[in-house]
Amino acid sequence: MENLPIELLRLIYAYCDPPSVRNLREANRTLADLGYDYLLPPNLSVVTWRQDVDRLLSIAQHERLRGSVTSVCIYLGELSYQDAMKNSWFQHFVLPPEERSEILASAWDSYDQIETRRKTVSPLHSRADDLREACSSLPNLTSVEVCFNRYPSENKVLREVFQEVACRKLDRAQTYGNLDAIIAAIDGLRLSSFQIDRLPLELFRLPDHRKHWFAHTHSFESLSTLHLTLDPSGLKGQGSAMRAVNGLGRLLLLAKNVRHLKLAFHPYSRGNSKFVIMFRELLNGFTYTQLTDLILEGLSCEEHDLTQFLERHGGTLTRLRLGGRGLAKSHEVSLGGIHLYSGTFKSLFKGLRTKLPRLERLHLEGIFECQHHELASHESYNFYPLTDENWQPVPCPRWVRSSRNTINCLTFEQYVLHGGPYPGASFAQQHFGG
């Protein structure tokens, strides 16, 4: 086998799973040498209950292995024990008692092991220097994701119960420190993608953390993908919110070359509420000259302000997603829609027909509602998803049924892209739940 061309051997390795790679490397010296490049997956995980920072640092210091890593996902989510116990019992209620007890006992044994290991591992923020050294020594690192909303356990019960928002806990002070460590670790790297699925918005009003972030965001200029899901539940009062939004705006302005932008708000204190945003204050008229894909979720805004923001990107924007799943429970309708406290969706969508000439796809998900219920122009829609954020089709959710008046956005997309009568007028006659 060692007599085969190098190109063919590399092709064979490319189709091998990790155990096969290890076995193949033991065959002879040639295969052992070639197999170095396939020992590691390109995507590495850092989990807070494992010694993954040490592992990452060792890989970064290895001359042959460090070039294999292109992306790192850092998992910071923690399970709320009491809430998870209660929810997991209800999730397995239909099982026979003995089977249910066995499954749940195994799950909580796994949880106990995780928490025992967590106590032996130093918090991420205390390893800031090691994390920075590791990231700066990975020459091909282009993507960093910070994940609070997935639980990387091998136990299925723990993974599933973690999908319930109530089963996640967040130590905000520790989270600030961990995020500070991460943003310092990536400072100066030429990243193409940076994503956080729960960023406490109040971090941008706290002077020390605010200064730290603005001093360590040089990597943002090279980003082509920036996905930020903000948690505004830690804000107290309008002044606090204004300062935090001002800080968020400064951060967004640094990512001036993004092509894919997601800006979502998940209010953990009130899962069905929307966060008020004025784009003219957030971005001060700034235009992303290369923006092709935009996701906006969980906002309350003015129709005119939103239209102006979208119009500025009419020359490049090809795919637009408004709304999303939000913080809905598994049995609930999507909550991350859009609220207009001024204007109507009819006027908004009519304007988009002419202001976004390059638009190819439009997707709506969640509860869309105008402010003034007493007016004849009032609109309220409950959209279920047709595609995921990568525009791949998804099956019709189980929570869709006619009694909930859920509809899909297909007729609205057709209206914006191709014209015709406004579909909102025939809302009551649309097919529900299909």
Residue ranges, per PLM feature:
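N-terminal Skp1-binding subsegment of the F-box domain
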Residues: 1-30, 126, 132, 136, ...
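Glycine-rich, aromatic-flanked loop segments that form ligand/cofactor-binding clefts
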Residues: 71, 90, 148
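Ordered, helix-dominated protein-protein interaction surfaces in large eukaryotic regulatory proteins
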Residues: 11-14, 26, 33, 74, ...
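Conserved beta-strand positions
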Residues: 46, 74, 146, 196, ...
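Hydrophobic regular-secondary-structure patch
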Residues: 2-86, 143, 173-176, 185, ...
